[in-house]
Structure formats: C-alpha cells, structure tokens
A protein has these predicted regions:
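Short, flexible loop/turn elements at secondary-structure junctions
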Residues: 53-55, 100-105, 184
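Generic structural signal of hydrophobic/aromatic residues within well-ordered alpha-helices
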Residues: 16-23, 30-33, 38, 99, ...
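Extended, helix-rich architectural segments
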Residues: 1-76
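Extended, charged amphipathic alpha-helical segments
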Residues: 134-192
C-alpha cells in the first residue's frame, strides 16, 4: 500500500507533481526512492539523503517550470561519506556543519563534494583509488550555499551510540543464522 501524504497548499503544484513522478532525475518515483533509502538504511544502519536543485539562469518560477528545473534527491551510502562534522547550537541541538562525500569514482579519479553552511565545493582528485591517495586535488566548482544549511538528512535504521552511525539489521540476521546453524548441528549430533 503506497503511503498517503498531505501536501496542503502545494497539492496539484506542477513542480511537486514532477518531483513525485521523478524524484532523483533518473526516472524513479518518490515512493521508489524512499523505498531504496529504507532498504539501504536497513543494510548499512544509515544512509544519507541530499536534496539539491540545479543551478539555473532562470529569473522566474515560470522559467524554471519551462526548463524543468526543480529539486531532486540523491542517496549516499556510508562508504561514500568521507567526513562530517556536527556542532551544537546555542539551543543545545546538534546540527551538521560539514559533509564531504564521494560523488563519483573511477580508475583515474574521484569527484568529491564538500558541503558547508557557506559553500558547496566540488573537487576532482586524481589517483583516488590508491590507499592514502596522494593524488592532486583540483577545485572544479565552488558555489555559495543559498540556504545556509547543509541539505542532507541522515536516515537511520536504528540509532547507534555514535552520531551519525546507525545499527544494521544484518547484525541480527547473522546471530540468527549462527543460532540456526548451531541448532542443526546439535540435532545432527543427537541423531548420530
């Protein structure tokens, strides 16, 4: 059964409808993307969801609609998150003030994206696949962060003791498999 959501005054909005039908700009619906987020969080313990919007020269919302410029979702698993930092606000709440992740990687280079409250920077790092890579990094793009916050949400399966590391369901499955194996071994010994 698909979830039901109340979008309030945005119900029927063209950009919202487009987003719900193609949430990741790769043809997958919002429900499908969120199902993948849930599955990855279950496997890894957590995963990151980043909401971004392409840079545009559109001056009005009508121009954005005509060019199909709208927010989209990207999913990053823990092995893609290289570094992060949380700070405590004056109210006592923790907030993310830096996130560094591997956006793309191949044999020759990696694309690293660094989110801060002030900027979003994209670097190309050569020879990234080597352990303790000493490859040169080159700034490809640095744009101001228009919202002043990092547009990322850490989705937990179960919260762990350390921020932002979650607890995977696979650990429970491993214990269950071990128990089943031990039970079968005991039964086999009783039969002999």
């Amino acid at each position: 059964v698909p979830p039901t959501r109340d979008y309030g005054s945005l119900d029927g909005d063209e950009q919202l409808t487009s987003f719900l039908m193609d949430a990741d700009l790769d043809g997958r619906s919002f429900n499908t993307v969120m199902r993948e987020v849930q599955m990855n969080a279950s496997i890894y313990g957590n995963c990151w969801v980043i909401v971004d919007k392409p840079q545009s020269n559109a001056n009005t919302r009508a121009e954005e609609l005509a060019q199909d410029i709208r927010p989209y979702i990207s999913i990053y698993t823990p092995e893609n998150v290289v570094n992060w930092n949380y700070r405590r606000s004056p109210s006592g709440r923790f907030y993310l003030d830096m996130l560094m992740l591997v956006e793309d990687i191949n044999a020759d280079r990696a694309i690293i994206k660094v989110f801060t409250e002030e900027t979003i920077s994209t670097y190309e790092v050569e020879e990234y696949s080597e352990e303790y890579s000493k490859g040169d990094s080159r700034l490809i793009e640095e744009i101001p962060n228009p919202i002043g916050k990092i547009p990322a949400v850490n989705v937990y399966n179960l919260r762990g003791a350390k921020r932002p590391i979650g607890i995977s369901d696979l650990a429970d499955v491993a214990y269950l498999q071990q128990s089943i194996y031990n039970d079968y071994s005991e039964k086999e010994q009783l039969i002999r």
